[in-house]
Regions:
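Carbohydrate transferase catalytic cores enriched for Leloir-type hexosyltransferases
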Residues: 1-333
Length: 333
């Protein structure tokens, strides 16, 4: 009997596209499961998506891991996989929850609701999926759950086209607005010296800070990430390490040499493919090398493309098929 999987398409955090849709399409290509696509927070938008009756009523409760069981609103499925804010209860089948954003589990952005929600889901038998080993350690520590309840499967990174003849210095800012403001003058000077410009991919609040500081920087919304990458000569991924570095990996896939901070997750996932800096004072010198050294760039492009294959949608789909089967076997044993 074919494995039937309920997949929530509303869980993507990506600026490059919907990673859950990419995962769904890749799962379909395997031919190893039957997908029931649904949306937990928004209305169904395609013919192949299942409409959830009274979704607007249940959705606020699902954010607390309460309310009606999701499989009561779906055709028969063997397992349900969600990755966003909703963790709906299930009845007599397992739930898999991808935890791709660690900000609600951390210090100043610590969100009691999210922590309670995830703990409640685990108490009911849910399996949590972290995007990296370092992220799994943080999830286990903060939630206080058993190591056996957390597994590691990287998310699908949306496909991007190869970048040719890019000229911009593109900086992706995630959770480190003040650091970027501090680095901005030297990045602007570098770009001017090399006949380029700085393009910052930023949240609305970060964009406002950049403009209020009068910085000569082109700011673009996250939804423009794909277009920005298409014109990049070098990408700098500035992150607090709370989320999977999908933009950096997409840059590697596109053949754009990439520089990133040596956070724990970046060392785990990007070392050997991107240039990692351990001190923010190293950024200018490292950037010069990555920008101007032809042989270094060629090596980085080859290594980056090789690494990006590990996070392609088809790779993620194979890993998730194995996880679905393992979780269903454990549930029915």
């Amino acid at each position: 009997m074919s494995l039937r999987v309920g997949l929530d398409l509303d869980g993507s955090l990506e600026s490059l596209g919907n990673s859950m849709t990419d995962l769904a399409d890749a799962l379909d290509r395997t031919g190893e499961c039957e997908l029931v696509r649904f949306r937990s927070r928004t209305s169904a938008s395609a013919d192949n998506e299942t409409h959830l009756a009274l979704r607007a009523l249940w959705s606020p409760l699902w954010r607390r891991s309460l309310g009606r069981s999701i499989n009561g609103l779906l055709p028969r499925v063997d397992v349900v996989h969600v990755a966003g804010l909703a963790t709906p209860p299930t009845r007599e089948i397992p739930l898999i929850v991808s935890v791709d954003d660690l900000r609600p589990l951390r210090g100043e952005t610590h969100t009691h609701l999210r922590i309670t929600q995830l703990r409640r889901a685990v108490e009911r038998g849910a399996t949590l999926v972290a995007s990296s080993r370092s992220a799994s350690h943080e999830v286990i520590s903060v939630l206080g759950v058993a190591r056996s309840r957390v597994v590691v499967v990287p998310p699908a990174v949306p496909r991007v086209d190869e970048t040719r003849d890019g000229a911009d210095l593109v900086v992706n800012i995630t959770g480190v607005d003040e650091l970027f403001i501090a680095l901005a003058p030297q990045l602007i000077a570098f770009a001017e010296d090399h006949g380029s410009r700085v393009v910052a991919l930023a949240s609305t609040s970060a964009g406002q800070k950049i403009r209020s500081n009068g910085l000569a920087i082109t700011t673009r919304a996250r939804r423009d990430a794909r277009d920005a990458l298409a014109n990049a000569r070098v990408v700098i991924h500035l992150s607090d390490g709370a989320r999977f570095p999908s933009f950096a990996i997409a840059a590697l896939s596109a053949g754009v040499p990439t520089l990133a901070r040596a956070t724990e997750i970046n060392r785990e996932l990007l070392e050997g493919a991107a240039a990692l800096v351990t001190d923010d004072g190293q950024v200018r010198d490292t950037l010069e090398e990555v920008w101007s050294n032809g042989s270094r760039r060629s090596i980085m492009v080859a290594a980056g493309r090789s690494r990006a294959v590990d996070f392609a949608p088809d790779t993620a789909a194979r890993a998730y098929i194995a996880l679905y089967r393992e979780v269903v076997r454990g549930w029915t044993a």
